[in-house]
Design a protein with these regions (language model features):
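Register position in tetratricopeptide repeats
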Residues: 1-2, 18, 35-36, 52, ...
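Transmembrane beta-strand segments of Gram-negative outer membrane beta-barrel proteins
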Residues: 73-91, 109-118, 154
Length: 321
């Protein structure tokens, strides 16, 4: 079309009207609309086709491209540099009361190769009898999401703490491969060191479908006695270009998240549910809030309820590109 998408769109619409059962025509129309930056409208055109042909590979591939372009556009209209602050808590009351909080302050920047973030975390723990502990700990962390190719990207992170509660060292590496039909797969490993080495591997399968993103993820905790596992399902509903709500369900014996604190080593098995809401208010401000509940085993014969919550704010700096 040599970039003449406004002229090509009426012709594509006429083709769809004359041949409504011709799937390639709807795919073409959806792509032409997306190339003009109208991603929600383009996704709706493809959704119409998928409602009658849910396995149409061309439509699924087009929808994945539209979602990716929409995400790229949302990054372009936000400031490339930001400062960010966050807070989280995690608490239980058996076999003793424990209230763990983490306050975070950091900064991020979007480079040509991807995004990087550096942060300082301050953790504070309060426990009830018999120990009656009230103590704090600092952690210094850095993470990045480099884009290796158009089909591959990665996540790398490292954190260090010299205190008694956070792991001394925490590192992670995960690689993603995008596939046709809106699919992606990943594999990675998380490493922690308290007074011994801990390795947790992870694999995932992801799927974009219209305004939804689904993910199945497994974790493998490598121990001297063997390998323990856990499994998690994520369902995300996009409310706009970047806004979403996400539900996470999980069960198993391997932690699904970093060991934030040494007392997490008590966990033996858990089932959990989490809900997260992310809102990009404008090019300068974005906001995230989440809550979760776990029913976990901490000894051979004892279980407990566990509650968590988190909130984060990001303030952009500089001009959007």
């Amino acid at each position: 079309f040599e970039g003449k998408y406004p002229e090509a769109e009426p012709a594509a619409r006429l083709l769809v009207k004359q041949f409504p059962e011709y799937g390639d025509a709807r795919v073409l129309l959806g792509r032409i609309i997306a190339w003009q930056g109208r991603y929600d409208e383009a996704a709706a055109v493809i959704d119409t086709l998928l409602s009658s042909e849910p396995d149409n590979s061309d439509a699924l591939s087009a929808l994945a491209d539209i979602r990716r372009w929409s995400h790229d556009r949302s990054r372009q209209v936000t400031a490339p540099t930001d400062i960010r602050a966050g807070y989280m808590f995690d608490t239980f009351s058996e076999p003793y009361e424990r209230f763990w909080q983490v306050f975070t302050l950091g900064a991020g920047h979007r480079f040509s190769w991807g995004t990087a973030v550096a942060a300082v975390n301050y953790g504070h723990i309060n426990t009830g009898p018999p120990s009656g502990t009230s103590d704090g700990d600092f952690q210094f962390a850095a993470e990045a999401w480099p884009e290796l190719t158009r089909k591959n990207y990665a996540y790398v992170s490292y954190a260090y703490s010299n205190g008694p509660w956070f792991p001394r060292h925490r590192a992670a590496l995960e690689l993603w491969q995008t596939l046709p039909a809106g699919l992606a797969v990943s594999a990675g490993v998380n490493y922690y060191y308290f007074d011994h080495n801990i390795f947790i591997g992870t694999v995932s399968l992801e799927k974009y479908l219209a305004k939804y993103w689904f993910s199945g993820r497994a974790y493998f905790h490598f121990k001297d006695i063997g390998v323990t596992t856990s499994f998690f399902l994520n369902a995300r509903r996009y409310l706009g270009t970047a806004d979403y709500v996400q539900l996470t369900l999980g069960t198993g014996t391997a932690p699904d998240e970093p060991y934030d604190i040494i007392t997490d080593l008590e966990r033996q098995k858990a089932s959990s549910v989490r809900l997260t809401w992310f809102n990009q208010i404008n090019q300068w401000w974005s906001f995230r809030i989440g809550a979760g509940y776990s029913y976990e085993k901490y000894s051979a014969t004892s279980n407990r309820n566990r509650f968590e919550g988190n909130i984060g704010i990001i303030r952009g700096i500089g001009r959007a590109k």
